[in-house]
Amino acid sequence: MNSLLVNKAAIVTGGSRGIGFGIAKLFAEHGANVQIWGINEEAGKSAAQDLSDKTGSKVSFALVDVSKNDMVSAQVQKFLAEYGTIDVVVNNAGITRDSLLMRMSEEEWSSVIDTNLGSIYNVCSAVIRPMIKARSGAIVNISSIVGLRGSPGQTNYAAAKAGIIGFSKALSKEVGSKNIRVNCIAPGFIDTDMTKGLSDNLKNEWLKGVPLGRVGTPEEIAMAALFLASNQSSYITGQVLSVDGGMA
């Protein structure tokens, strides 16, 4: 077992697959007690059991819709009762409802904003008091290259992901004096279920804009998250780490 997060208590939202699963796995490999939050109970419990078996760390699952403030607050209290502290939070949960703005429904707009951006408020506002009390904590918010440069058909997603960056920079200034660090990761074109559904033509068009000429992996995002969650980045806060093969 590696040792960057030994005995740290970590929450990873949207951790049952893709980037979130990669982050939860690497954290567990580095000794963290990890709780995966998600809305698919079967997938979440399976992922948690798989990681527990493979890493030897304590990995659990909690059924939490991060767009629901009361649900988030209740689970934070349960987490504190079990672990006594919250050392690391990774806000990774997110959805897409792509459409050109002229065709985008209010529901498509609101659902993405509520889940991708509203959840950041819900989770951070619930964990920040115990972190302040402990005078310690690391928050890693997963944004996107789309939040930095935009993408047609994704005004809702781009607005949410750009909002995450602004939120994180502001919060980092509020809580830095309490030894709490808040940073963002902006992934580029990453090999996940979301990108697997794209046509070959669209994938090839995306790859033309990637100087490194390939798709990234969830493990590469996880390495960035591990860095920002651990003391390896103890003097870094309010920053956006682009992991995008040079796209930005």
Swiss-Prot record:
Top EC group: oxidoreductase
Catalytic activity: a (3R)-hydroxyacyl-[ACP] + NADP(+) = a 3-oxoacyl-[ACP] + NADPH + H(+)
Residues bound to substrate: S144
Alphabetized SMART domains for the sequence: PKS_KR (SM00822)
One annotated GO biological process: fatty acid biosynthetic process
Pfam families attached to this UniProt entry: adh_short_C2
CDD domains: BKR_SDR_c
Entry GO MF terms: 3-oxoacyl-[acyl-carrier-protein] reductase (NADPH) activity; NAD binding
Keywords on record: Fatty acid biosynthesis, Fatty acid metabolism, Lipid biosynthesis, Lipid metabolism, NADP, Oxidoreductase
Catalytic residues (positions): Y157 (proton acceptor)
EC number from the UniProt entry: 1.1.1.100
Pathway the protein contributes to: Lipid metabolism; fatty acid biosynthesis
Protein residues bound to NADP(+): G14, G15, S16, R17, D65, V66, N92, Y157, A158, A159, A160, K161, I190
Function: Catalyzes the NADPH-dependent reduction of beta-ketoacyl-ACP substrates to beta-hydroxyacyl-ACP products, the first reductive step in the elongation cycle of fatty acid biosynthesis.
NCBIfam families: 3oxo_ACP_reduc, PRK05653.1-1, PRK07231.1, PRK12826.1-2
Family from the record: Belongs to the short-chain dehydrogenases/reductases (SDR) family.
Assembly and binders: Homotetramer.
Name of the protein in question: 3-oxoacyl-[acyl-carrier-protein] reductase FabG
Species for this entry: Chlamydia muridarum (strain MoPn / Nigg)
